[in-house]
Structures are given as C-alpha cells and as structure tokens.
Amino acid sequence: MYRGKRVKLEDETEGSWKSFAAVRMTAVDDISDSTEVVEMEDVPSQFFVEKHSWDGLRDIIHNSRMYSGMVINKAPHDFQFVQKHDESGPHSHRLYYLGMPYGSRENSLLYSEIPKKIRKEALLVLSWKQMLDHFQATPHHGVYSREEELLRERKRLGVFGITSYDYHAQSGLFLFQASNSLFYCRDGGHNGFIQAAPMKPMEIKTQCSGIRMDPKISPGDPSFIAFINNNDLWVTNIETAEERRLTFCHKGLNNVKEDPKSAGVATFVIQEEFDRFTGYWWSPAATEDADGGKTLQLLYEEVDESEVEIIHVPSPALEERKADVYRYPRTGSKNPQISLKLAEIRTDQQGKMISAQNKELVLPFTTLFPGVEYIARAGWTKDGKFAWAVLLDRSQQKLQLVLLPPALFIPVSVDDPQWEEHVEAMPEGVQPFIIYEEITDIWINVHDIFYPFIQTSNDKISFLWVNESQTGFCHLYRITSLLKPGCHQWSREYSPSEDDFKCSTEEEVALTSGEWEVLARHGSKIWVNEETKLVYFQGTKDTPLEHHLYVVSYESPGEIVRLTKPGFSHSCSVSQNFDMFISHYSNVSTPPCVHVYKLTGADSDPLHKEPEFWASMMEATGCRPDYIPPEIFSFPASSGFRLYGMLYKPHNLKPGKKHPTILFVYGGPQVQLVNNSYKGVKYLRLNTLASLGYAVVVIDGRGSCQRGLKFEGALKNKMGQVEIEDQVEGLQFVAEKYKFIDLSRVAIHGWSYGGFLSLMGLIHRPNIFKVAIAGAPVTVWMAYDTGYTERYMDVPENNQQGYEAGSVALHVDKLPNEPNRLLILHGFLDENVHFFHTNFLVSQLIRAGKPYQLQIYPNERHSIRCPESGEHYEIMLLYFLQQHL
C-alpha cells in the first residue's frame, strides 16, 4: 500500500499532534491537484484496537483481576530466624514470618521449621504453620480508624490482617496490632516452642479510648510495652496489667487548631517524605537499681505544629464529619517545631511502676543544634550508652549524625533555680557529639544504614555507615570518630557553635566503591557478623536492573562476593547466626519464589562460603495464559547516560501494522520502574493493554533512583523540565528499533509524579502525545509539602523560575484545543496530593477555554483502595484509550 508524503507541509502548530503525523496521511486521491509534488513511500497500515462496550471491558478487567487475586500478596515476608539448640531434634531453625495462607484473605503470623538435613535429590517445600488459632486480625467490616487508615496510606499497605509485629528474642514474645486492639503471644525463648496446635493470642486490655498505635516491646524488660494513644506515649506491663500515660502533650480536643502538640508520633511529612513511621525508641538497656528495681528509658520526639498550616478536605462521602482536617506544611511555609526528650520509668522488684519522669535536653534542641529542621532517624547504641539521631537542615544538603548521652537530659524544670539545680547534678563532661557530617550541593537521600559497634575505649566510637554524597554513589564505610569532650559550662546564656560538639574522624574506610549502589533506603538492612568481621548487604554491583545479596570484609575490605544467582532480582534476609539466608526473587518472565539457602564451606574462609539451596518456602506460580513478559532494552541518551526501558509488545502483532502506543510513566525521584523483576502482579494492567493490541513502553529517565546522585540529581531545581525529553528520546529509539510503534498514536499515562509528567508531556510535546491520562497530579509545586518539594526545588523564593516552569497549571495555554486529548483522575480525599491541585488545574483550563475530561473518586485518597474504584479506573482507562487514541 502506498501513502503520500507531502514535501510541503503547512506550518506546524504547537498544539497539534497532527503535524507530527502528517507523514502518515491517507493515500493520494486519484484526482489530487496535479500541481502538488508528491513522493511515494511504502508505509505500514495502522492496527486499530477492537472497541468493546463498557460491560465488555468490565469482563476483561474481571478476568485479569481474578488471576491477580490468586497471587497478589501471597509471598511470605518480614522474616525472623530463631535458632534451635536441641541437638537431638530434626530442625536447626524456626522461621517466623507474615504471610497469607492458602484460602485466606488476610495476613497472619506463621512459622516454618527448617530441617538440619535434606535430601538433595528432592525439592523440600516447607509447610506454612499457623501460630494463631482462629484469629481474625482485620477490624470488623474492614473499617479502620482514621489513624490506621492514614498510616496505611503512608506505608502504601494494601494487605489486611497483621501487617507488622515486634519480637523479643530472649523471651519469645510477639506483639502486634490487630482488630483495633493489641495482642501478644509467646513462642521460643525461655518457654520453648509450641509443638502442634496454634495458640490463642492474649489481648492487652486498656483504659484508653481510641486506637493504640505503634506498639513496641521494651528490650530491657519485655514485660513492658509502649504504644501511642491520641498522640501521646503510654506504657503498660503485660504481666500486671498496670498502664500509665507517660506524656501529656495532646489535649484530646476535636479542634485541631487548639491541639497542636504530640509526643512519640512521626508527622505527616516525616512519614511521607522521610520514611520514618515512629517517633519513639526504647533503650535496649535496663539499669538495675540497688534495691532490685529497674530504670527503663524511652527517647521520643515532641512536636509542636502550632505554626503549621491547616488544610480542610470537605467531602459528602465523609457524612458524619463534614470535613477532614490536617496539618500540612506547604513548601516555603513553617514546619513543626521539634525536640527530643526522654521518658524514664522506675520499677520495684516486682515490676510495679514506682515513678515515671519526663526529661528534656539541658538546653533547647534549637540552641544545641541550630539550623536543624528534621530528625530523620533516631535510636540507641546496642549497649544503651548513647541515644543517636540523624539531623537534617531545611535544604536537606547537610546531615549530622549525633550521639546524645542520657545524662544530657534533665528533669523538666518549672523555673530557673530548679533548672540550675538539675544542671549542677549533671555528671562532668556530658555533651552531645556530632560524630559524622555530610554536605552536598544536590540533596541528601536519607537512608536506614547505621551500625554502631560497642565502644572499646571511651574516647572513640566505630560504626558502619553509607554515604552517597562523597562519590555520587551510595557506598558502605567503616568510620571511627574521636569523642573529644569539651569543657562546657551549661547556662541559659550559653549559645554553642556547632564546632563545639563536632568530632574529628580518625579513620574512614570505604568497604565498597564503583558506579553502583548499596541499597540503603526504604527499610534496607545490613547484617554484621562481628565474629568473622563480615557485613552482608544488598546492592546493584552486577547491574542496575537487579538487586543481589553480597558480602565483604569490613576489617580488610577488598573482594565483594555475590551470594544470589544472577538473572533475577532478589530481596533477602540473613539469619541471626549468619548460616542461612532467605531470598524472595523473580525476573521479568518468572513469578516470585521464596527459597532458603544455607551457607556452607570452611569456617577458616567465611567470606567464600557457598550458598546451597536448602528448602523452598514458595514456588513460582504459573503465569496466566495470556501473560507475555516485557522486553528490557537500553539506549545511549543524548544526556550522556545509558537509559533503560521496558517494552510490552502487542500480543496480536501483525507484520507491517503500526500499533497504538502507551507510555507508562512515573519519572520522579526514589522510584525505579525498569528492573529484572516480575511485573505480572503490580503492573498487570500493562499486560492487559498489550493483550488488547497496544504497545506499552516504560522508561526510567534521569531523576529515577539507583543510578547515582548525578543521575537522580538532574532534576535539581527543575522538576518537569528534563524528564519528558528522556521519555521522548526513548520512544523514538523504540520506534526505530521496533517498527510496529505508531508515533502518531501515543498516549502518556501515570499516577502522582507520573500524572504530573503526563500533563507535562501534553503541554511541551503535544506533537508527540495524542492523549494524556493524568492520575492525582501535582499541578502547582507551591501547594505541595516542604520535605519533598524543597529537597528537589529549594524554597520558592530561591527558585521562582523553577517553580513556575514546573507548575503545569500555569501553562494550560499550551495544552491542545482538540477535545478528548486530556483525562484527569483524582481521589477527592487525597491527603497527599490534595484535590486542590486538580481543582486549580480545572479552573485554569476553564478560564483558558481548554477541553478536558475529569473522573473523580469521591471516597479515595492518593492510592485507590476500594476494589470497585480500582475496577472503575481500569475500565475508564481502557475505554478512553479505545475511543480516543
């Protein structure tokens, strides 16, 4: 078939994709103007997706969801190895975990026995055993409290039932939240292991009204647990049922404006943008008193949000409460005032609480640490000698790792004479120590890796840490800092400079190096064997597309040994005595499986112990019949970086046909979409699109993670200005390589940052993107939160041009005038990217006379949770695409 390519085209109009598609115009009419010069070329014909009715699309979605419901969230996770010391018994470990047993719809606490010996010729699949007897963990009718609902949003939890647990190894105590209450049970520890029947968990009774959140066991005395109730810290003794409120910050008022304080609770920004979900930390040590009693300590964050803006989210769906009200600090506005405090509990010989006392820092937090805006992480050293905290300035370009001796906290004083009396009682030489500092001109990605060793002398401390700003890639270091005490005369007038507490570094040894990353964010862990001087960690040394478990010596670093098999991406957990590890792994064509490996070899050479397959926890389920895995591709971009992408080929690919194409995009920091892991569950809809005849392309451009700080930092101060070019370059590469891509019919679709980029694509490259489908988009950066926006864009007064260029609502004049090219979707109750963003965008669209379609989900937040809403969204997506692409 021949199609005319006109040599002379009309002037391009920026708002029309048709100018780009003009080279694919219909066949030249036999009576076309003889004066027009026409060149003839062989152009493939277009493939058109079959149009289904709404009900037909619902059936398609039902079928795909039915399969995903069989496999989603089935894999066990949150593993805890417990070694068995019964020499005559058949099992070496009991493995505890959370999982969803066959036929169940909710997560439960389970265990498996790991045998000492196996038959190598047979596949051993460990049985999943219920720990809890006939226990419903999900609240009645699935209704969560507001606090639980919001925490589930921050943690992106989609599962029901038990979603986390705390465990105390010596006593075998398990503690968890379920059914709007707290429960505990025991297995292992001093009491031995249950042998057969599941146990009935014990409910922890309370005098509190409202939900109890964030329960934790005291490591120093497992009779005591702490929890949060109504934004204050409480403690209870599960043996005596004695309960006590430790802090009195919150008044329990319905009026948010008049009740701004909390204790032990991570604020919205800290949870959402820094991945810290707690605000208190038990000391691992319990001090024995002379009379046989104990002193227990908790470090906690106290927050005052008096000056933080209040946001109202009205909704008819809320019925009994006409509006939801939140504290939400928009970029450039006031953040909460923060401090660290200490709660101290004294008990008698019988464990009865004698007293509880709150202590504050000898000087205000802002005086000791001027310029600090965020407490990103906190905790205790293993011996309880120091509390520690990771502190960030507002620009998030300066990080300080600080040690705080408990003696630095004094009883809360009512007046100056009392304060002076408490200061007089302080031991000599007590001060904070800034043991490490990082400074960058890009931003600091907060991580979860800090391993302090027990001090061998009082004047120094050694620890393992990761640093990204030093080389541009996240790597492990062994650091020794000198704790040089100063001669500080504590007084109300004393105004320390930060140099007063800054420690010099005696030694900083890189354990890893190169253009790859040690995984350190989003709950990543390391496992340190102090006996063999080895550290086990996860990273991307082999390829940025796969996560593997590695081991290296921290005493004499050199060779880095990979323990997991290549060709897959792994998520691992190492046993507490370093003889086993468990891996949840998959690749693009193999669904996840979970296997246990034993490290075998000579004890004289622990670095080179070989992983031996030991048992299976879960085998890969078969792919659904119509699942075709995506192909991973890469190309050298004009930016100088190699970019990676995925392509889902249309299932009914016809030779010589051009298929409509969907660019699925996220494109923002801290996310990597393209990797060698199974996509058949979370991204099942992309396979569904391919099964209908669409080509689907996914590209990780500059700004995405695990490629180094320079790669991610390309967005610095210019969000929305670089990402689309990488996406377009990738599309053009794919179209050149795979001839079935129809560049005249490209849709761009994403959610959250991907929704923002979908709008940006239609604004800046309307000649490339025929339609955009934008879910929950940020449309004006001035309305997003401090922690995220300022990290990447600075404060508005320092980057006015960047804020204006990156705010899509200010550029609606560049959107096309043709109808059916823009669909916006948003949950009305979204407390992260508020519906204000879509509201403001739509107002601007109306003012500019631009066409659009809007789909609101009245009962949804930032993530669509309700199955009916999720189904409607997917049908809406398919219907819009088949009608308008």
Swiss-Prot record:
GO terms for biological process: proteolysis; regulation of inflammatory response. GO terms for cellular component: nucleus. Keywords: Aminopeptidase, Hydrolase, Nucleus, Protease, Serine protease. Disruption phenotype: Knockout animals display a marked reduction in body size and a significantly shorter life span. Pfam families: Dpp_8_9_N, DPPIV_N, Peptidase_S9. Its EC number is 3.4.14.5. Val-boroPro binds at S752. The keyword Zinc does not apply. One of its GO terms (molecular function) is serine-type peptidase activity. It is found in: Nucleus. Its main location: nucleus. The keyword Nucleus applies. It catalyses: Release of an N-terminal dipeptide, Xaa-Yaa-|-Zaa-, from a polypeptide, preferentially when Yaa is Pro, provided Zaa is neither Pro nor hydroxyproline. The active site is at S752, D830, H862. Homodimer. Forms a ternary complex with NLRP1, composed of a DPP9 homodimer, one full-length NLRP1 protein, and one cleaved C-terminus of NLRP1 (NACHT, LRR and PYD domains-containing protein 1, C-terminus). Belongs to the peptidase S9B family. DPPIV subfamily. Dipeptidyl peptidase that cleaves off N-terminal dipeptides from proteins having a Pro or Ala residue at position 2. Acts as a key inhibitor of the NLRP1 inflammasome. This is Dipeptidyl peptidase 9. The lineage of its organism: Eukaryota, Metazoa, Chordata, Craniata, Vertebrata.
